[in-house]
């Protein structure tokens, strides 16, 4: 399914993004994996780690600095992409509680940007990660992820 495909991973330098990228490189012969994140240092660190772990495959990785809150930048990253794995989120419960505007911008507006870019760029499939905290949410993180889930479902 993923052989010879281009995959974009939002939050690609996070714990899920790194594990997913390793799994894909271990099991598929992808055309390209775009690691999309806003943290330049984490991208640099991940690239160096993957040069050691996957010296013959690191050329398939592209490190794209950007934020899911920036629709124009994200659309640029989506050119030629077959699949998006959306793992970017503001996910620490206390950080969301103390920074509600940032949580909404990233987790809800970011989801809307993923959907719009995927539709505009003819992306074949989007897989959006969620959390158990979106079921009967009791905090802002759960609430923003519930809204994000509803947006992705409505876009089907």
Name each model-derived stretch.
Residues 25, 29-45:
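Conserved glycine-rich Rossmann-like NAD(P)H-binding loop of the short-chain dehydrogenase/reductase
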Residues 39, 49, 132:
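Residues in the short beta-alpha loop(s) of Rossmann-like NAD(P)-binding domains
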Residues 37, 64-65, 105:
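Conserved residues in the N-terminal Rossmann fold of short-chain dehydrogenase/reductase
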Residues 41, 69, 91:
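Adenine-nucleotide cofactor-binding loop residues
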Residues 5-27:
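N-terminal Rossmann NAD(P)H-binding glycine-rich loop of SDR-like oxidoreductase domains
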Residues 56, 62-83:
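Conserved Rossmann-fold cofactor-binding substructure of NAD(P)-dependent oxidoreductases
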Residues 83-86, 90-150, 154-156:
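Conserved Rossmann-fold NAD(P)-dependent oxidoreductase catalytic core, especially the SDR/UDP-sugar
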Residues 46-58:
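Short, conserved SAM-binding/catalytic segment
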């Amino acid at each position: 399914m993923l052989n010879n495909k281009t995959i974009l991973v939002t939050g690609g330098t996070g714990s899920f993004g790194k594990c997913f990228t390793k799994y894909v490189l271990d099991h598929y012969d992808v055309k390209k994996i775009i690691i999309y994140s806003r943290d330049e240092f984490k991208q640099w660190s991940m690239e160096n780690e993957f040069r050691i772990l996957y010296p013959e495959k690191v050329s398939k990785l592209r490190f794209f600095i950007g934020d899911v809150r920036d629709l124009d930048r994200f659309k640029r990253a989506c050119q030629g992409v077959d699949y998006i794995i959306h793992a970017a989120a503001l996910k620490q419960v206390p950080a969301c509680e103390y920074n509600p505007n940032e949580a909404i911008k990233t987790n809800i507006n970011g989801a809307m940007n993923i959907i719009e870019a995927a539709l505009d760029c003819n992306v074949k499939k989007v897989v959006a990660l969620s959390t158990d905290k979106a079921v009967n949410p009791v905090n802002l993180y759960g609430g923003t992820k519930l809204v994000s889930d509803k947006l992705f479902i409505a876009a089907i």
